[in-house]
A protein has these predicted regions:
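Alpha-helical transmembrane segments of polytopic integral membrane proteins
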Residues: 49-50, 85, 163, 167
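Active-site recognition of the HExxH zinc-binding catalytic motif
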Residues: 51-62, 95-96
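Short, hydrophobic transmembrane alpha-helix segments
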Residues: 19-34
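Membrane-helix interface segments
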Residues: 4, 30-34, 63-71, 144-146, ...
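A generic, lipid-embedded transmembrane alpha helix
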Residues: 38-53, 73-82
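Hydrophobic transmembrane alpha-helical segments that form the core helix bundle
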Residues: 36-43, 101-195
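N-terminal membrane topogenic signal
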Residues: 1-11
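Membrane-proximal soluble regions of multi-pass membrane proteins
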Residues: 63-113, 173-229
């Protein structure tokens, strides 16, 4: 397929939007196990929204059309809690060029909770909080409050934890081999686990070594790296 990037981006955005629309009308019963399954599915799709924005930052969501690539990235960053695409891009490139140093905006030499707090404060702004609050109060006029919390707000929070844990904390924590200039480790080669945890982003050494690869090609890169080693 020539335009895989557009296909994957469109698929993730469409599935997220359709499932959210359905779930905002879903009758919630907290004894219903499907409520929790749907919440996790929505979390995974929301994470996919950010991963698509991330690929756009690297210019690989739609590599043959810079304008469309940037538009998709801007759109995905915006619906991911009103993130500023230009700010994300600037900080993410700083992360790649200064990985695990004081200049790395994603790095913190501390425990999980303090690192996550620093990570969140690095990117979240007061304007995002205000816009999310306005959006919530407007949507509350149309949809049940508990549906908004369970299928929109909680997945938004969980997806940041998912991205942080599998895409920052696990790959970059602790000591790294001196020979590893990327200072990024990868999870074990298990494509199913890697996909459901964070769209292969757990193959983080491969991402830093080949930042021009979109998320769906990291599995192949992992296999090649393992074969070489």
């Amino acid at each position: 397929m020539k335009n895989k990037g557009i296909f994957y981006a469109f698929t993730i955005i469409t599935l997220w939007a359709l499932s959210l629309t359905y779930l905002l009308h879903y009758k919630i019963n907290f004894y219903d196990p499907l409520v929790y399954v749907f919440m996790l599915v929505q979390t995974h799709l929301y994470t996919g929204i950010f991963i698509t924005a991330h690929d756009s930052i690297h210019g690989v969501a739609v590599p043959n059309n810079k304008r469309v690539n940037k538009w998709i990235g801007f759109f995905c960053a915006t619906i991911f809690a009103y993130n500023n695409y230009e700010k994300l891009s600037r900080k993410h490139h700083l992360h790649h060029s200064n990985v695990v140093t004081e200049k790395d905006p994603d790095y913190y030499d501390g425990n999980f909770f303090r690192w996550y707090l620093k990570f969140a404060l690095e990117y979240i702004t007061i304007w995002q909080i205000i816009l999310m609050a306005i959006t919530y109060n407007l949507l509350k006029l149309i949809f049940p409050m508990e549906n908004l919390i369970v299928f929109w707000e909680i997945p938004a929070i969980l997806s940041t934890l998912q991205l942080f844990y599998f895409g920052t904390y696990i790959p970059h924590r602790g000591e790294h081999e001196l020979a590893d200039k990327y200072k990024a480790r990868s999870q074990k080669n298990n494509h199913f686990v890697a996909f459901i945890t964070c769209y292969y982003f757990g193959y983080h050494h491969e991402h830093h070594a080949y930042p021009y690869l979109p998320w769906w090609q990291l599995a192949v890169a992992k296999e090649k790296e393992d074969a070489l080693n």
